[in-house]
């Protein structure tokens, strides 16, 4: 009976609920001061062409809180952190399921772990 109930429950769940969303960040581990950092977020399990979908970049300096950097949405609208907007560019390639963040004029204070996230 338990197996039957589980099977029936699975059959009533929309297929999109069962899809697995993954995001993977890639880029250099280190950049020198004044260089440009380019990070790529490759994702699966959703489409950035779908209305309401967004991808953000955030970072976390060692021992500090998360800091939001930038967001791009399905309609190619772009939003940036006020304090960093002159140094950041976010773009997307929906054919490759990728969002790219570039950050110019890197400085030691930019030392952090950088993450992308679906919003």
From Swiss-Prot:
Disulfide bonds join 41-116. One of its GO terms (molecular function) is antigen binding. The gene is IGHV2-70. Keywords: Adaptive immunity, Cell membrane, Disulfide bond, Immunity, Immunoglobulin, Immunoglobulin domain, Membrane, Pyrrolidone carboxylic acid, Secreted, Signal. It is found in: Secreted; Cell membrane. Immunoglobulins are composed of two identical heavy chains and two identical light chains; disulfide-linked. GO terms for biological process: immune response; immunoglobulin mediated immune response. The modification Pyrrolidone carboxylic acid is found at residue 20. It comes from Homo sapiens. Residues 79-116 are annotated as: Framework-3. It comes from the Eukaryota. The keyword Secreted applies. One of its GO terms (cellular component) is extracellular region. Residues 1-19 form the signal peptide. Residues 20-119 form the Ig-like domain. This is Immunoglobulin heavy variable 2-70.
């Amino acid at each position: 009976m338990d197996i039957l109930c589980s099977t029936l429950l699975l059959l009533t769940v929309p297929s999109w609920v069962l899809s697995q969303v993954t995001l993977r960040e890639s880029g250099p581990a280190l950049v020198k001061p004044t260089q440009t950092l380019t990070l790529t977020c490759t994702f699966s399990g959703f489409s950035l062409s779908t209305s309401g979908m967004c991808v953000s970049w955030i970072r976390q300096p060692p021992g500090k809180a998360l800091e939001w950097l930038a967001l791009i949405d399905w309609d190619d609208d772009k939003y940036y952190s006020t304090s960093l907007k002159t140094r950041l560019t976010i773009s997307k390639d929906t054919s490759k399921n990728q969002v790219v963040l570039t950050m110019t004029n890197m400085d030691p204070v930019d030392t952090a772990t950088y993450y992308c996230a679906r919003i």
